[in-house]
C-alpha cells in the first residue's frame, strides 16, 4: 500500500489505539476542545465533511468509559445559570424526536436542552459529505434506511408527516438499479480464488433462492467440484434435507438449530463453503450462521426454505417471510430525519427555506445550535456523567464538555442515550432495573464510505452490490442513488462517486458462544483496530475485487470515512439464546421503567434496532413525563 490517506485523516482515528485513552481518566476532564473544520470552508465547524475515523470518534467516548470502567468522574461541577423544562441526554433520532413530541405537547416556548457526547447530532444517523469540483457527494454514516414505514405506529407516522417526508416520492426518486432497495437489481458474489477474487455469474440473491440459472452461477465459483454439486442440489429445492423428521420435529429443528448446523450437518457443506451465504446474515444479526437459528437466517434472505419440505408452509404462515417489506432510502441514510428535526426545533440553523425538498443539499450552521435565545438548545461534545432528582423535584444533570465539568437543572430529564451507560448515570436506580438494562449488548458495526475519482471500474462489474462473505467488509455497494432532498447522484461512470462498504467485526465463533458474548468481543475488536488497519483492509479488498476491471486504489481513492460503531444496533432477542418472557417481564421492559422525573427513550428500550422504535420510545417517554 504505497499511497495512504493524509496524516490529518490518519490522526483523526489512530490516536485511540486500543480504544483506551493514552491519558488517565482524570486527565480527560482537563482536555481542550477538539478542533473540527470544514475542508471546503476553513475554520468553519462542520463535522459531516470530516474523513478518517468517525462514528465513535476520538473525544466521544473517553469520559463515559472512565465512568463505566473505573467509576471516575469530576468531583466538582460549575452550576450554570440555566434551567430547562426538559433536559434530554442524547441528540440522536430518539432524543430529537423526544424534543419534538415534548414541544408539540407543551408549547413552542418550552425550554429544552439536548446534550450529546459526539461532535455532531444524529446519533447513529450520521451523514458523510465529500466534495469534488463543486459537486456534493453524500454517504451513509450509520443508520441506513426506513424499513417498511407503512407499518410504523401512528405516532411514528405522524412524526414523518410533521417533517414533510413524502414516502411516495422516496419510492419514485431512487434508481431501480440499487440492489439494497430492489433485490431484482443485479448483485453478485465475490470470493477469493487461486488467482484472486472471482465474481460469480448471475443475480446472487436470485441464485440463493433457486431462481435463474443456478447451475451456471454455482459452476462459476472457485469451489471444489464436490461442493459445487452439493450447492446445486441444495439450491434447486429438489431435496428435503429434513425428511427424516416428523412435521413437529421439523418445526422444532428450524427454531432451535443454527443455520450453520443445517448447512454443514444436513446439506453437508464444508465450513468455508457455508460462509458464502453469510453476508446478509452478518449485516442483519451481526453474527454469522453459527449463531442464528435456521428460521432467523431464512428471514434474512438466506437459502433453504425450498429445501425443508412441508414445514416451509408453516414458516411462511407464521414467520411472514413473503416479500412484503420495503426499504426506503435518503441519499445520506437516515441522517435526513435528524436534520429535518433539528431544522424544525432550531429554525435558524439554516438560512431560508429548508424542508424535505432540499434538505439533502442544505448547509447547517452549527453555531446556531446552542444559542441562549433558542427555546431548544443542542449542545455537542458534552458527555453526561450523572442525572438525579433533587429534593425540590427538579433534576440535576452533570456533564463534561471540553474538559469542563458543568451542571444544569431541568424539571424533567429523558435519557435518550446508550442504555448501558444509564446505571452509571443513575446509580439510585433499583437493582432489578439495572439488571434489566445490563442484559442486552449492542451489536458492533463498521461502515465505510469511499470517495472515488470516478465510477468507471465499478461500473464494469455490472452490478450495484457485491457480497464479499470472506472479506473484512461483507458488502460493497454504492451510496443511495436517489434525488430525494435535492441530491444529484452520479449520472455516468465518469462522475465521482461514493462506494459504501458494510461490515461487522469478524470474531471467531465456535457456535457455543452467545451472541451477547460475541458482541462484547466484537466491540473490543472495533475499538482496538486503528484507522490505518481499516484503511489497508479497504484498499486491499477493493483492489482484489475491482482490480481486474481497471481499479487502482493508489490513484482512484480520494478519501475514506470510516464509521465505527462499537455500540451499534440495539440488541434484539434471538431464538437460540433468549427465553420467551411474559409481557412486561422482558429485560428491556423492566429496564425502561420510569424513575420519577427521569424516563428512558432509545431503541434499546424497545429491543428493536430500527428508526420507528427510536421514535416510539420518544413518544412513550414524553407521555410518562407529561401525563
Pin down the residues of each PLM region:
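Glycine-rich active-site loop/strand segments that organize a redox cofactor
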Residues: 42-49, 122-154, 299-320
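Active-site/ligand-binding neighborhood in enzyme catalytic cores
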Residues: 236-382
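Extreme N-terminal leader/targeting segments of oxidoreductases
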Residues: 2-85, 104-109
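Mid-domain catalytic core of redox enzymes
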Residues: 374-376, 380-510
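N-terminal glycine-rich phosphate/pyrophosphate-binding loop and immediately adjacent elements
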Residues: 72-252
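Active-site rim elements
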Residues: 139-150, 245-252, 323-332, 433-439, ...
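Conserved beta-strand->loop/alpha-helix structural units within folded catalytic cores of enzymes
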Residues: 85-100, 115-118, 380, 384, ...
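Conserved flavin/dinucleotide-binding core of flavoenzymes
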Residues: 34-75, 129, 192-195, 400, ...
Amino acid at each position: 500500500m504505497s499511497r495512504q490517506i493524509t496524516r490529518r485523516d490518519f490522526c483523526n482515528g489512530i490516536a485511540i489505539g486500543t480504544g483506551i485513552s493514552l491519558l488517565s481518566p482524570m486527565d480527560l476532564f482537563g482536555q481542550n476542545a477538539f478542533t473540527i473544520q470544514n475542508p471546503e470552508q476553513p475554520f468553519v465547524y462542520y463535522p459531516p465533511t470530516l474523513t478518517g475515523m468517525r462514528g465513535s470518534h476520538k473525544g466521544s467516548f473517553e469520559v463515559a468509559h472512565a465512568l463505566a470502567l473505573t467509576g471516575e468522574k469530576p468531583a466538582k461541577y460549575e452550576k450554570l445559570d440555566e434551567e430547562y423544562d426538559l433536559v434530554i441526554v442524547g441528540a440522536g433520532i430518539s432524543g430529537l424526536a423526544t424534543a419534538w413530541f415534548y414541544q408539540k405537547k407543551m408549547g413552542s416556548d418550552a425550554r429544552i436542552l439536548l446534550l450529546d457526547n459526539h461532535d455532531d447530532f444524529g446519533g447513529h444517523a450520521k451523514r458523510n459529505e465529500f466534495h469534488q469540483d463543486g459537486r456534493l457527494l453524500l454517504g451513509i454514516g450509520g443508520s441506513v434506511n426506513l424499513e417498511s414505514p407503512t407499518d410504523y405506529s401512528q405516532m411514528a407516522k405522524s412524526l414523518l408527516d410533521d417533517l414533510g417526508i413524502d414516502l411516495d416520492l422516496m419510492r419514485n426518486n431512487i434508481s431501480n438499479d440499487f440492489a439494497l432497495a430492489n433485490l431484482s437489481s443485479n448483485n453478485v458474489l465475490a470470493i477469493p480464488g487461486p488467482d484472486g477474487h472471482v465474481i460469480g455469474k448471475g443475480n446472487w440473491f436470485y441464485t440463493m433462492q433457486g431462481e435463474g440459472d443456478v447451475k451456471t452461477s454455482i459452476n462459476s465459483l472457485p469451489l471444489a467440484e464436490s461442493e459445487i454439486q452439493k450447492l446445486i442440489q441444495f439450491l434447486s429445492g429438489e431435496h428435503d434435507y429434513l425428511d427424516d423428521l416428523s412435521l413437529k420435529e421439523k418445526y422444532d429443528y428450524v427454531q432451535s438449530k443454527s443455520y450453520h448446523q443445517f448447512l454443514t450437518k444436513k446439506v453437508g457443506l464444508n465450513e468455508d463453503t457455508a460462509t458464502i451465504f453469510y453476508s446478509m446474515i452478518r449485516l442483519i444479526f451481526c453474527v454469522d450462521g453459527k449463531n442464528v437459528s435456521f428460521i432467523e437466517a431464512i428471514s434474512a434472505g438466506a437459502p433453504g426454505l425450498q429445501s425443508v419440505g412441508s414445514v416451509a408452509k408453516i414458516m411462511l404462515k407464521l414467520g411472514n417471510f413473503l416479500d412484503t417489506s420495503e426499504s426506503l432510502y435518503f441519499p445520506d441514510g437516515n441522517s435526513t430525519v435528524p436534520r429535518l428535526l433539528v431544522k424544525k426545533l432550531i429554525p435558524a440553523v439554516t438560512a431560508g427555506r429548508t424542508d424535505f425538498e432540499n434538505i439533502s443539499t442544505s448547509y447547517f450552521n452549527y453555531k446556531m445550535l446552542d444559542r441562549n435565545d433558542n427555546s431548544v438548545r443542542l449542545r455537542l461534545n458534552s458527555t453526561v456523567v450523572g442525572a438525579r432528582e433533587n429534593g425540590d423535584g427538579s433534576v440535576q444533570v452533570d456533564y463534561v464538555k471540553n474538559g469542563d465539568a458543568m451542571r444544569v437543572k431541568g424539571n424533567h430529564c429523558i435519557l435518550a442515550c446508550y442504555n448501558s451507560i444509564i446505571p452509571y448515570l443513575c446509580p439510585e436506580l433499583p437493582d432489578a432495573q439495572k439488571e434489566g438494562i445490563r442484559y442486552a449488548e449492542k451489536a458492533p458495526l463498521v461502515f465505510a464510505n469511499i470517495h472515488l475519482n470516478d465510477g468507471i471500474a465499478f461500473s464494469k462489474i455490472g452490478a450495484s452490490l457485491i457480497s464479499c462473505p470472506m472479506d473484512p467488509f461483507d458488502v460493497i455497494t454504492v451510496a443511495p442513488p436517489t434525488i430525494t432532498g435535492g441530491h444529484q447522484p452520479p449520472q455516468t461512470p465518469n462522475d465521482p462517486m461514493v462506494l459504501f462498504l458494510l461490515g461487522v467485526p469478524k470474531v471467531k465463533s465456535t457456535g457455543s458462544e452467545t451472541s451477547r458474548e460475541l458482541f462484547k468481543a466484537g466491540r473490543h475488536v472495533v475499538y482496538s483496530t486503528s484507522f490505518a488497519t481499516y484503511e489497508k483492509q479497504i484498499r486491499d479488498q477493493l483492489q482484489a475485487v475491482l482490480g481486474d476491471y481497471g481499479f487502482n486504489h493508489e490513484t482512484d481513492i480520494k478519501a475514506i470515512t470510516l464509521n465505527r460503531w462499537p455500540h451499534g444496533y440495539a440488541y434484539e432477542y434471538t431464538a437460540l439464546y433468549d427465553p420467551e418472557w411474559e409481557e412486561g417481564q422482558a429485560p428491556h421492559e423492566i429496564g425502561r421503567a420510569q424513575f420519577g422525573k427521569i424516563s428512558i427513550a432509545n431503541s434499546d428500550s424497545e429491543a428493536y434496532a430500527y428508526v420507528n422504535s427510536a421514535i416510539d420510545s420518544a413518544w412513550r417517554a414524553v407521555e410518562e413525563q407529561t401525563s
